[in-house]
Amino acid sequence: MGGCPSISNQQSTMTSSRFRGVVLLSGGMDSCVCAALAARDHEAAAVHVSYGQRTEQREKQSFLGICERLKIRHRLIVRNEALGMIGGSALTDNSIPVPTAENVGQSVPVTYVPFRNAHFLAVAISWAEVLGAEKVYIGAVEPDSSGYPDCRPAYYRAFNEVARTGTKEGKIEIVTPLIAMRKAEIVRLGLELGAPFDLTWSCYSREDAACGVCDSCVLRLRAFTAAGAHDPISYAVK
């Protein structure tokens, strides 16, 4: 049926309660650090949602590579066709140009995918319920971000109430360990954890070399500079 999520690459359908953490892993810098935290504290399971975004294949490659490096064996890749069909974002509609960081402005940018994180969380919470996991990790960040409304603390407080009231046992908690951190702090934390930044992908528009000019690339480059660290991925413009 058109628009329904499809699921692939699930290495295990185990329902063991030892999977205490499910982490949403896009393949970007923030989600990579979040995954490193989850893998440190739990036997984690990782879920990746593809939704027809411009860099879909590159992000999926990053997801698999990060899982290998962090030794996360239990993985779920879900394709959500609905977000691509709905459109309304430069990430899913090729007729809408991806703006450079200097042209983003003060309002919510066109790279915002409408209510995207709700789709992601629904998948992760459902899987957590099957696995018996009690925590769902997501690398949402409010400071030094593009200003997306689904990256605010109030959003996750509300979604935690949804998870509490809408699951069988009501014990699943959405965890946002990075939400109040500056990007440079996230880089430093990732380096301490051994997060594989070399495998991550943040660019909104390109899959060969990161463009270096979209909002996501610029925020990432500034973060590494502020942290006094080297960004290990390649850029077309730096």
Regions picked out by a protein language model, each given a short descriptive name:
Residues 172, 198-203:
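Acidic interhelical loop/turn segments
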Residues 167, 225-228:
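Short amphipathic alpha-helical interaction/hinge segments
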Residues 1-2, 6-17:
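Short, basic, low-complexity termini and linkers enriched in Ser/Thr/Gly/Pro
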Residues 5-6, 90-91, 231:
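Polar low-complexity intrinsically disordered regions enriched in Ser/Thr and small residues
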Residues 100, 195, 222-226:
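A polyampholytic, Gly/Pro-enriched intrinsically disordered region
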Residues 122, 201-222:
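Local cysteine-cluster metal-coordination motifs and their immediate loop/turn environment
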Residues 206-207, 227-238:
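Short cysteine/histidine-rich metal-coordination sites, predominantly Zn2+-binding motifs
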Residues 12-194:
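ATP-dependent adenylation/nucleotidyltransferase module used to activate substrates
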